[in-house]
Amino acid sequence: SLNISPETKLGKIEGWNPEEFLDKSNKKTYSITQGKSTLGKFTETELKKFLDSKNVGVATNGVMYRSDKDGLLPALLRKWFDERVEYRKLSKKFHEEGDREKSDYFDRRQYLQKVVLNSLYGVLGLSVFRFYDVDNAEAVTTTGQSLIKFTKKITNSYYNKELNDTKDYCIYIDTDSVFYSATPLVKKRFPNLNIKDEDKMSKAILKIADEVQSYLNNGYDYFAKKFCNLDKHRFD
């Protein structure tokens, strides 16, 4: 994923728009700012060669990050995430052993880790924070927005292709998730299935959910490469 951290930030592509950049008819030229310096004009082809040669990822707001070495913030997040996983395992272990006190303790610990994990990138936009950087804060939010909108778009595409229509089937969209009903696909595939039969509906929904998730994961590979210039990601 994007290696967002103060020391991995390389500069910013002015006027960057990933969808526009992918348009083959795009004749726009781009400039890159690095501190107070500006690197000339790049065509779409020249910019692509530049990004590949430098091995950098690009956020939706145009900020570039080196990909060859882990940044401080991603390293911290990985450490805290691994600790949360361990706390959750311990909470489950002690719960199964009947030790409620220790189970509750580690459950609280894992929850605190979750709060810290969710807060780190958000606090980048706080002016009193040690690593305050508007570009980095915007890189997180704009790329997240772009990814969730992309998710909605390709999920609708999946539904539209199978149902042969152009409807928007998204029920709700959040900062990190989209909600869809599997019922339209169930009715199309199993017209004689009684949707009130919970057992059969559950099996049908799980099958569809697995298929849609696999489709989305392939889409995320495309998003990472084309929108962010990344070969590896954790968008799944």
Question: Which stretches of residues belong to each language-model region?
Answer:
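Conserved acidic
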Residues: 1-236
